[in-house]
Every structure is written in C-alpha cells, then in structure tokens.
C-alpha cells in the first residue's frame, strides 16, 4: 500500500469490484471477542481520507449513516487486503472524541499520548491473537 492512500480505490488494484460482504473475518472477530482484555465493542467504522481530523459536519453525517467510529485508516487497507484474499481483522484504538462531540479542540499531542499509553496493551492483545491463529 502506498504511503498516501486516496479516498478512492487505488488504481493499482486490477478490479474495483471487490466483494466486501464479509470484509472482516467472522472467525477472527469471534476470537477477538473471546480474548480476555480483548475487543470491548463492535460497530460500524466510517473511513475518511485524512490526514486531517474530520469536521463536526462529517462526524454528524457519518453518525446519521450509522457509523459508531470515524477515522483516517483501516478502510483502504481492508479493501487492498481483501483484494489479495487475506483474512482480515480490524481493531481500532479510540484515542479522541470526534470533532463536535465534546467541548474544545482535538489536540494532536494528546491523541499521540493516548496511543502511546495504550501501545503495550494493544501489542499484548495482538500477540495473543496471533498465537491463536
């Protein structure tokens, strides 16, 4: 996957018609749910191109369409991986409230800090998942 991923399917994927009916593996999702300290919730992820945070209007649009979470990654990588036939599990680490859902501005330093604080727990979970696969 290129370093910059556009909001459309990259032209390097031979077919734009990739079946995403089961984008995320039911088997791996079940495994992640059963792990101690694992996945605490499942939901609908809305992917935006980034690299900027979403606007309050984009967050509200995604909410109205049924999204529980918004972010700048995951979707494009999933499409590419499914195109290659990979079994995919997605785990999102929520590091901030979406724009417009809490007072104040999103602080990129705080987002990085929250990610760094959770890195060890996330690495442990991923290692335990990989040990089970």
Q: At which residue positions do the language-model features occur?
A:
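Glycine-rich phosphate- or other oxyanion-binding loops that anchor nucleotides, phosphorylated ligands
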Residues: 1-95, 102, 108-133
